[in-house]
Amino acid sequence: MIYKVFDDMAQCCSAEIMRLKGCVSAQRLEQAMQYSHMFGQYCCLKSYEMLLELLNQMRSTPDKIENVEFQYNEYGAPYLLHGPYFSISHCKAGIAVAVSENPVGIDIEAVRTLKEELVRKTMNETEQQSILVDTNPDWAFIRLWTKKEAYLKMKGTGIISDLKSTLNNADDAKMTTYDCVEQQYVVTIVEQQ
């Protein structure tokens, strides 16, 4: 499995979007232009460029992949017809992409002020307690949230079920979480074992 995180979001500008438009498939360009704001367009285009970089790193031949077309499963999750597995995530703090021969999920989230109602809706009792006793509950919540979202992405379903029980049976996955304190975000990568 390989992954890449990009967090120089100051590069989001109209000139960079124009450059990226020339590097993506027609399908991805159409998806990017569905965003009404420049930031969404940038993240959509930049994540595609990052995906191509990672796919080319994984190849055993010198032929470069110039573009890929996504297929979509019944839940709307994108996949590549002939593999490998991939996952893309973005937030205001950055963009994260993972590629693997096994099902993989990645999530990046900016750390923000904890909302108790959201904690009650998304975390089970044990998770809620671990957040409350943590010296930094905002970070503790985001760590758990990214684990849940990355796990569901690995499963290919997205958020379709009770989030409180998401990690109860996650023994089939390896989870790795990174905190970027300087840029104020958390990234979790989950790969099926």
Feature annotation, model-predicted:
Residues M1-Q193:
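Core catalytic alpha/beta fold that binds nucleotide/phospho-ligands
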